[in-house]
From Swiss-Prot:
Name of the protein in its database record: Na(+)/H(+) antiporter subunit E1
Compartments (UniProt record): Cell membrane
Entry annotated with the keyword Cell membrane: yes
GO biological process: proton transmembrane transport; sodium ion transport
Domain of life: Bacteria
Assembly notes: May form a heterooligomeric complex that consists of seven subunits: mnhA1, mnhB1, mnhC1, mnhD1, mnhE1, mnhF1 and mnhG1.
Family of this protein: Belongs to the CPA3 antiporters (TC 2.A.63) subunit E family.
TM regions (residue ranges): 1-21, 27-47, 49-69, 101-121
Single GO term (MF): monoatomic cation transmembrane transporter activity
Membrane topology: Multi-pass membrane protein
Gene: mnhE1
Organism of derivation: Staphylococcus saprophyticus subsp. saprophyticus (strain ATCC 15305 / DSM 20229 / NCIMB 8711 / NCTC 7292 / S-41)
Length: 160
């Protein structure tokens, strides 16, 4: 991906030199032409087309933002209730992510959502130990993480 971005920027600057007009609009036009060339050369350049990865990163950010808002609402409900009836619990989350950076990213995203914190990762990197402030059932918690955060983290790391 980094090579594709670099090639795109070099071709954009080359476009400025060829046209002789050094303004922002001309750079954007050159960037778009270079983007087309990078797309055509995607078989030669390593990795998948970088705009797909950028799209997946934006999707990851939006999914995390939605999960963050939902978790904040849940924690607010717990805090403003007059009686305390939440059930905090520890549970083990089994992940099938293989790359270390994906596991770390997933762990950080889980920790950043209010009401959950990652306590550790097993040595074989298949289990994440989590504390939840309001635990319903393990199946619900696991499905919530697997269907949202882990899914988009896996998509970002596919076909690098």
């Amino acid at each position: 991906m980094a090579i594709q971005i670099l090639v795109n920027l070099i071709l954009s600057v080359f476009w400025l030199f060829v046209t002789g007009s050094y303004n922002f609009n001309n750079f954007i036009l050159g960037y778009l032409f270079a983007l087309l060339l990078v797309y055509i050369m995607r078989g030669v350049l390593p990795g998948r087309f970088y705009l797909i990865t950028v799209y997946k990163i934006i999707k990851l950010f939006l999914v995390f933002l939605i999960e963050l808002i939902k978790a904040n609402i849940d924690v607010i409900r717990i805090v403003v209730k007059p009686n305390i009836d939440n059930e905090p619990a520890f549970f083990t989350y089994n992940t099938d992510l293989k790359k270390d950076w994906q596991i770390v990213l997933l762990s950080n995203l889980i920790t950043l959502t209010p009401g959950t914190i990652v306590l550790g990762i097993s040595d074989d990197r298949t289990k994440i130990y989590i504390h939840s402030i309001d635990f319903s059932t393990k199946e619900e918690e696991v499905e919530s993480i697997k269907s949202s955060l882990e899914k988009v983290v896996r998509e970002v790391g596919e076909n690098e």
